[in-house]
């Protein structure tokens, strides 16, 4: 039986294991000055995205959030201006865990936070971007708040998260994936993106328009090495950390893996099934510390609101979405 054909139902584990996972979930989102964000308040206040959205289903899963986030960064780092901004103005090298926590928390606030909490946070992020500028190794100037760069960063994140869920957790129909992209547009505009994809077709066009600027870089390999061997995940999850990072690489569009020289990191078929089983299990695990669960409580919805009646028809493809974007001539 395919893992996606199993009827899903929310689960709560025995207390010691459940408690360990609750602590791990809290630590993964402990981001220093932003860690005081309360997803339970203000009571009754809606988020930027509705509770019945595809986005709320996708972002509740910690495995696809981690895998998709790594995929997004790999794709971001392929663009030289974004790469310079990320590598020179963030703590990925010196403190990758803190950087990942801040990024993950920002994503959670954007999707699940009350509007009165999310909008000021996004405004702070934009002010920070206003101060980020420099030159690439080739001497080209960049500013982090350039719409073209923000469009790329947003698109890679949107692709990474939804594709990780679709591939490793539960297949989404084309309609659901298109809905997911459309749901994110209002938040993308707040972040400063001007042409955020509203559908997979829009994403394909954006990838085509950016492909000739993407290039191989040793920084991508440095980032992957940090993610594979650094103390990123809680101790009890370290045995699968390398597997999950390679799953993220495997999720990167095939043509881009070729440009970045990453084809050697691909998963074996049995490894892909292992990730899918872990992802399916994570999608049933109701953690009180998960912002998705807390946001449901804020809206007076059941804690397991996002965890019931989510089985997918087995006829939906579980494979990669490989957009027909051609590599540059010298990469063929």
For each predicted feature, which ranges?
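Mature, function-bearing regions of proteins
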Residues: 1-152, 156-332
């Amino acid at each position: 039986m395919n893992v996606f054909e199993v009827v899903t139902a929310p689960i709560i584990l025995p207390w010691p294991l459940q408690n360990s996972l609750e602590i791990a979930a809290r630590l993964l989102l402990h981001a220093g000055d932003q860690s005081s964000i309360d997803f339970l308040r203000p009571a009754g206040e809606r988020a930027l995205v509705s509770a019945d959205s595809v986005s709320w289903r996708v972002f509740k899963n910690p495995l696809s959030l981690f895998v998709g986030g790594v995929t997004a960064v790999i794709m971001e780092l392929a663009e030289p201006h974004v790469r310079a901004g990320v590598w020179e103005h963030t703590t990925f090298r010196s403190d990758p865990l803190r950087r990942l926590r801040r990024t993950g928390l920002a994503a959670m606030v954007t999707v699940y936070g009350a509007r009165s909490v999310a909008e000021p946070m996004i405004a702070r992020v934009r002010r920070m971007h206003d101060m980020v500028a420099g030159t690439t190794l080739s001497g080209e100037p960049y500013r982090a708040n350039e719409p073209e760069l923000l469009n790329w960063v947003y698109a890679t994140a949107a692709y990474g998260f939804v594709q990780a869920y679709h591939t490793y957790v539960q297949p989404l129909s084309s309609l659901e994936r298109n809905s997911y992209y459309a749901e994110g547009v209002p938040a993308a505009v707040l972040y400063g993106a001007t042409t955020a994809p509203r559908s997979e077709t829009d994403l394909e066009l954006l990838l085509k328009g950016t492909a000739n600027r993407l290039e191989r870089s040793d920084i991508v390999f440095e980032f992957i090495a940090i993610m594979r061997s650094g103390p990123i995940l809680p101790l009890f999850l370290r045995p699968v950390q390398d597997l999950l990072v390679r799953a993220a690489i495997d999720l990167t569009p095939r043509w881009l893996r070729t440009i970045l020289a990453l084809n050697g990191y691909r998963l074996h078929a049995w490894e892909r099934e292992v990730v899918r089983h872990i992802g399916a299990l994570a999608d049933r695990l109701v953690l009180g510390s998960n912002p998705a669960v807390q946001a449901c409580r804020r809206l007076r919805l059941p804690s397991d609101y996002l965890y019931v009646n989510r089985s997918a028809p087995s006829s939906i493809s579980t494979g990669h979405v490989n957009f027909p974007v051609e590599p540059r001539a010298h990469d063929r």
